[in-house]
Amino acid sequence: MKPSSSNSRSKGHAKARRKTREELDQEARDRKRQKKRRGHAPGSRAAGGNTTSGSKGQNAPKDPRIGSKTPIPLGVAEKVTKQHKPKSEKPMLSLQAELELLETDERLDALLERLEAGETLSAEEQSWVDVKLDRIDELMQKLGLSYDDDEEEEEDEKQEDMMRLLRGN
């Protein structure tokens, strides 16, 4: 005779039993009931909120409707005029530092590049560029610098190079 096949199955791991429709419905109702309970309890604001976080030394619960105990003046008091403090002026930069700031200004560089490319600037942008360039010229004059110095140095270097070439031949 053949050994029964049910015995071989029972020795292995038992299959998980499937839940019936009634059990599934009951679990769904329980989940829905728990979901409805979320949030604060009704009347928690008037009752004082959390009762678990009360201090041990205080027997009477604190009424949340009672506000601040700071005194409020009921009479008309003279207004105290505050003395205006003069705004602290920006520290003056040295002429050299101001010149370096103007020369490395990104907005000025971008606008000058647009001008070199042939674009026209708005009146506001053009006036801003003019003011900054005038300030750069003024600072360079005060510091004794000029644009011509750079050009003359380049010309001097070219002449020296020419002289070296001529001497070498």
Swiss-Prot record:
Compositionally biased residues, Acidic residues: 147-159
HAMAP family according to UniProt: GAP_YihI
Assembly behavior: Interacts with Der.
Domain of life: Bacteria
One GO BP annotation of this record: ribosome biogenesis
Listed Polar residues bias regions: 49-58
Keywords per UniProt: GTPase activation, Ribosome biogenesis
Tagged with keyword ATP-binding: no
Organism expressing this protein natively: Escherichia coli O1:K1 / APEC
Region (Disordered): 1-92, 146-169
Start-end of Basic and acidic residues biased regions: 20-30, 160-169
KW Transport (keyword) present: no
Pfam families linked to this entry: YihI
Protein name as annotated: Der GTPase-activating protein YihI
Role according to the record: A GTPase-activating protein (GAP) that modifies Der/EngA GTPase function. May play a role in ribosome biogenesis.
Bias-annotated ranges (Basic residues): 10-19, 31-40
Family from the record: Belongs to the YihI family.
GO molecular function ontology, one term from the record: GTPase activator activity
